[in-house]
Amino acid sequence: MNSLEIFLNIALGKNKFAILVVEKKKIIFFKEQELLNHGKRIIHENFDEILRKSILEIEAKFRISLNKINLMIEQEILESVDATIKKNFENKKIDKKSVEYLIQDLRFQVIKSNPEKQFIHIIIRKCFVDDDEYNTVPIGENCKVFSVEICFIYIPKKFLEELEFFLKKNQLDIKRIISTNYAKSLLNKDTENLGSAAVAVTQDINLKEVNIYRKNRVKYGFFERIFRIFV
């Protein structure tokens, strides 16, 4: 069953924990439970116990050894940082490498300025060429000024570190961190369906999103997508 994807969703405002198993875009296991709230802290021994029991249940049911999960965080209000970066092309042609470096530079600046934040999604908002908005990056076109607006979705790094402590206790690594709020926004309908949201975000539906991997590494292949279309 190598095609199984495991999703762990933590709803911060609702103090709920859900675990899903997805196979070929189909939800084949779903379990949701309440979490005890110790003040503002919901990630504690209660979570550890529920997580351990859920892991054992899934491993027994599907005869697998569970060691990686997709972590989904559902916030009361989506938290993000918006930023813009420009480059003067001096009436030269726009080239792919310059655009790549431009976006990477903005990403590094935002991360450096916000050390307490863990950025989990990077979304291309708009692209401008000499103040004209474009739906695609016009590679090869002469340009004075090129600019791009980007949204950086984040969760508090302290919360993530606390959560990772309990995951490691259960021999679990994080494959991908997902904003549940953002994942639900990708759906055309039924936006409260957690299972559909989990599936949607793994299918790279939003071509404007930069793929982020653990250890702050960006999948450079995303640039091939932003040159095609903005949605």
Predicted regions and their residues:
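Nucleotide/phosphate-binding catalytic cleft detector across ATP-hydrolyzing
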Residues: M1-N15, E23-S65, I73-V231
